Curated annotation (Swiss-Prot):
Entry superkingdom: Viruses
Official protein name in the record: Uncharacterized 25.0 kDa protein in regB-denV intergenic region
Amino acid sequence: MRDSRQPVIRSSPSAVMGKYRNGQFMCHGMAQTYRAYREEMRTFLTGPYLSLMNAFTHHSDARVEEICKNEYIPPFEDLLKQYCTLRLDGGRQSGKSIAVTNFAANWLYDGGTVIVLSNTSAYAKISANNIKKEFSRYSNDDIRFRLFTDSVRSFIGNKGSKFRGLKLSRILYIIDEPVKSPDMDKIYSVHIDTVHYCCNSKCCIGGITRPQFFVIGMQ
């Protein structure tokens, strides 16, 4: 018979077993392993994504140069669509955003300009701050006039007016949200009608600027 003076110790299953996930209890050791695995999976495609971005940029430049040597040059918008746009449609938490951040920081380090567009200007600023933080690891240069943010709606509606009068180096557009194809066409038009004329002549081949468009998701 239990001594009535002995305290009764009650413990919940979670205190004994650890965390409850997917219908099963996990011990604390398993929970730590799961967290480490989840963090590793969050970045496991960062390297391949970076390789893809660099390979695409080099191939894009070579292709545009080759086209500009021919007598017939297709419409500017067709060039941007076919040879200067990379669509990154991978899943969430696969390392895609980290890869884009690293690539953009290197683009700035090489003297380029980055324009981040998103559904809201607030979200675009979050992405830009991540890029700025990554860039600060390499350089203390002032990039206030080489890293810009805007919402897709504002960029299209204002026809890129915020860039008028600026002297821009080669541009990397990061469209940081899924965007419909008609809106992409409007973004191309704004670049052609306005932003194109702000670019330094060194960014051109045969009078054609060589921006890159990285679209994270496409509808």
